[in-house]
Amino acid sequence: MNDADVSKQIQQMVRFIRQEAEEKANEISVSAEEEFNIEKLQLVEAEKKKIRQEYERKEKQVEIRKKIEYSMQLNASRIKVLQAQDDLVSNMMEAASKEVLNVSRDHNSYKKLLKGLIVQSLLRLKEPAVLLRCRKDDHHLVESVLESAKEEYAQKLQVHPPEIIVDHHIYLPPGPGHHNAHGPSCSGGVVVASRDGKIVCENTLDARLDVVFRKKLPEIRKQLVSQVAA
């Protein structure tokens, strides 16, 4: 092999090495670019995920805030409705109290009512002797119906007429606005107790009104709610 052949082979080897080096460099470049693109894509996706999570978190906060505000507004509305209902009930109670006060002004009707209240009290207590309290203004009316009340009670239970002692020392308070506008008041009726004071039947007009009103209160509130809903 002469020098020309050797030189030719060397050039071929150099070209081969150079070509292989270029191919390897190209492979490395392509691989590096692919890795870079993958890493870049991963970073982009991670950032997108982070943004989505932040958006969802803020969206949930907004929804929670809306629910809280709605609940507060709903509660405020309910409180207003309940307050309006309470005001209406109070006005109804006040109007009823005024009507009850008028009952004692009709002496004939009130006299019959007093007798009925006394008989009812006696039937509840079923005591042979009782103490009765009334308003000072009603004292003469009570005295006028005592005997007939005792007889009616005795006939109903087939017993001896009871002894009724009218308290002349302690009276029930006068009607509203009688003298002391800010003190206790009584629209009428009686309070009957056993002699030892252990059993008491409060049969005043105010107590009867309160009992009736408490029984009717659920029905009244139901009607008020239906009126508001309509």
From Swiss-Prot:
Protein transport in keyword set: no
Keyword rRNA processing: no
UniProt cross-references to InterPro entries, sorted A to Z: ATPase_E_C, ATPase_V1_Esu
Sorted UniProt keywords: Hydrogen ion transport, Ion transport, Transport
MF (Gene Ontology): proton-transporting ATPase activity, rotational mechanism
Pfam families linked to this entry: vATP-synt_E (PF01991)
Record-level GO cellular component terms: proton-transporting two-sector ATPase complex, catalytic domain
Protein function: Subunit of the peripheral V1 complex of vacuolar ATPase essential for assembly or catalytic function. V-ATPase is responsible for acidifying a variety of intracellular compartments in eukaryotic cells.
PANTHER family in the record: ATPASE H+-TRANSPORTING V1 SUBUNIT E1A-RELATED
Record's subunit section: V-ATPase is a heteromultimeric enzyme composed of a peripheral catalytic V1 complex (components A to H) attached to an integral membrane V0 proton pore complex (components: a, c, c', c'' and d).
Family: Belongs to the V-ATPase E subunit family.
Protein name: V-type proton ATPase subunit E
Organism, as annotated: Citrus unshiu (Satsuma mandarin)
Organism classification: Eukaryota, Viridiplantae, Streptophyta, Embryophyta, Tracheophyta
Gene: VATE
